[in-house]
Amino acid sequence: MNDIIKVTNVSKAYGGVKANVDISFKVKKGSITGLIGPNGCGKTTLFNSIVGYHPIDGGSIEFDGKEISHLRVGDIARLGMLRTFQQTKIYTKMNCVDNMQISVSHRRNSKNGIFASRKGEIRERAEDLLEFVGLYSKRNLISGDLSFGQQKLLEFAMALMNEPKVLLLDEPTAGINPTLINGLIDRLGRANQELGITLCVIEHNMRVIMNLASHIYCLS
């Protein structure tokens, strides 16, 4: 497998605080890669650097063979790399289907991009993906009324609407009750195997990451 993400000697500091120092790692195309380490070691900062939320101070970041460290979030998203967050970023006053439909913004010209111009097809895809993550029965509910775990599943489905090549997930099981964790593990695995999405996952739950990832990096 080729490397779809290649991080080389990346450093990032906030004033006098060094969040990342000479970090290097690779993510193989089609893999699930884990990123572990204690709180405060710079995992989330590294994710933010990769997707363009802030400039890096040194090093390089390549995505699918292209240097992206100079690009902004929207440009990187349009190339096919998205991320989710520890705290969900959903529209809590809207129902689940509307959340899904409004999320279609980054990759209008994807291989299945024709659906993006057809409202009925967008809704059909939204409902299919809600079924994929186990939220079809909740599709018309206001998303703010969902449990936190269900909101994380919704955010995951919203990312899938944009057909990413790579999805970075920041602690996807944090705050989720144990009964939902197994279902989330299953759906992440299916997204990788059935949809061909490369996953890079920050996770503190070692059972989860050992079950999911084929490669694991540790930041100290």
Q: Model-derived features: where do they sit?
A:
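Conserved ABC transporter NBD signature motif
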Residues: 59-66, 79
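Conserved catalytic motifs of ABC-family nucleotide-binding domains
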Residues: 163
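Catalytic Walker B motif of ABC-type/P-loop ATPase nucleotide-binding domains
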Residues: 167-171
